[in-house]
Amino acid sequence: MAQQSLFYSFIARGTVILVEFTDFKGNFTSVAAQYLENLPSSNNKFTYNCDGHTFNDLVENGFTYCVVAVDSAGREIPMAFLERVKEDFYKRYGGEKAATDQANSLNKEFGSNLKEHMQYCMDHPDEISNLAKAKAQVSEVKSLMMENIEKVLARGVICEMLGSSESQPQAFYIKRTQMKRKKWFQNMKIKLIVLAIIIALILIIILSVCGGFNCGK
């Protein structure tokens, strides 16, 4: 059994805690309620340190996914846990399903899911770390590719515009709309190709990390 590095988690809509889980006794609910009142509502990820513990949050579309961990757990494992919980929660209650639920109304339905995800992340720290590194690599590759694509597109359009203006100055303004349309189609075509490459990279990296098709769920 792995060390208990994650010990309390909740999911809230605004300041309403819909579901929470912990194996420990304490005033977690009241602390969480006060904590939510001061948490930024914008979509983002936050980590706050307090007395050797971290409050790790993922805020998205009005929902807050939070896990309290020991400081030594770092940031990768808590954030990986939150991503897993968010995906699971959205599959079950996405859209309007969780928009009107009352406080703690999902404890019975989803509390055990929080426990399972928590235990999985604590039991598989190496896998979590490898996946985090893989995602970082994919994000870096995507960022570089998109940056280069934008530069190539911009250069091509500028050259074409200059060529048009030199050979036919009177048609320069007329062709602006055509060139914008052409640039949009070029942009979409290349982005679709990049998306396919990125998906292939993600699959290759995940398969290499998990050892083929034997990834644990």
Swiss-Prot record:
InterPro entries: Longin-like_dom_sf (IPR011012), Longin_dom (IPR010908), Synaptobrevin-like (IPR001388), Synaptobrevin-like_transport (IPR051097), V_SNARE_CC (IPR042855). Residues 130-186 form the v-SNARE coiled-coil homology domain. It is a single-pass type IV membrane protein. Pfam families: Longin, Synaptobrevin. SUPFAM superfamilies: SNARE fusion complex, SNARE-like. It is found in: Endoplasmic reticulum membrane. The gene is VAMP723. Belongs to the synaptobrevin family. Residues 10-114 form the Longin domain. Residues 214-217 are vesicular. Involved in the targeting and/or fusion of transport vesicles to their target membrane. Residues 1-192 are cytoplasmic. GO terms for cellular component: endoplasmic reticulum; endoplasmic reticulum membrane. It comes from Arabidopsis thaliana. The chain crosses the membrane at residues 193-213. This is Vesicle-associated membrane protein 723. Highly expressed in stems and roots. Detected in flowers and leaves. Keywords: Coiled coil, Endoplasmic reticulum, Membrane, Protein transport, Transmembrane, Transmembrane helix, Transport. Gene3D superfamilies: 1.20.5.110, Longin domain. GO terms for biological process: protein transport; vesicle-mediated transport.
